Amino acid sequence: MVMQGLYDIMALGNKSMPESVFPVDGTPPPEQGRQGKKRGPKGKPKGRMVIPEARATIAALLGTIPLRRDQLIEYLHMIQDEYGHLSAAHLAGLADLMKLPMAEVWEVASFYDHFDLVSEGMEAPPARTIRICTSLSCMMQGGEALLQKMQSMRSEGKIDADVRFVPAPCLGACDVAPAAADGHHLVGYANTDNLMRVITTGTPHDIPDYIGFTAYRAAAGYALIEALNAATDDAHAEMVSGLMSTLSDAALRGLGGAGFPTGRKWSIVAGYDGPRLMAVNGDEGEPGTFKDRYYLSSDPHRMLEGVLLASHMVGITKCYLYIRDEYPEIIALLTKELARLEASGLLGSLEIELRRGAGAYICGEESAMIESIEGKRGLPRHRPPYLAERGLFDHPTL
């Protein structure tokens, strides 16, 4: 299958090239001269042909998992994690495997800062990237000076050329400023000594101590969920009605700025025909903000129990947890705890899927997050319709 290259992307934007442009055998047609004469080939077409070896490499990397359009960003993460960049050949191979236009894959990959795209003829970046936060909190603690120092040491040959240092926006680790990230490992209180030690030894940042599933259950965690799971249909409806009244009486409001009543929002979503979905926004990107990182890294089951409670009250069938790519330790611990929660049987029929962002600040906005979960660029949606009516995959979304 022939894929569009960079020239096609600039020329067509989001449009796919008609299938009739190329013959069925995948051979590009000769170019037409000014007099209508056919021109011979000038060489291999740039970025258009799928390289079988690259396609096979991506197929092996992805394994036997069923390919889903909404998982495109995760597949891009897998390639970035494996090779340290996204080459045009690998993107073409991925597009071919997913039966998507190359333009569509490229525009998604190029939208997110954590993907390093390498076009034909471009030199691949160093194999290892260390991002040093230069946002406000870290800047005040010497982040910019540290970045300059590490870059100077690399220029002087004191650090291997396979390592590069780049500035980064807020990593959500303001409590340990200045912070740095060596791939998926956070380095708190970063300085030349501990960064050199990380470069030399590759010592990862350990998962923090937190209240795990067993300890949370021992403190009466999920007791209400157990009662809801065990209730008859009539008893369940009565319990949900009482819980919804309690939520409304509590006068809780959203913290996104509009202050919309939480109880009313949940009731609105519950009023639409299903299936109903939920998206948990863990993509805080405001400089100086790390509240989500704090509670998720210390007491994750408090959030997860809230998800299960909402699933009963609103009738949610599937929930997506969208977590910042800058929080790898949280992604690791949530993966572990979700497996324990599923094994316990408390989830019932609810599905929970963990998604990671890719460094796009705008995805903290709810509709941009929805677009990203669907595997697209994180562009905010026009409203109405509101997400409560038509959100994720056009379903009512809490």
Language model features: what each stretch is:
Residues 2-398:
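Feature of Fe-S/electron-transfer and energy-metabolism proteins
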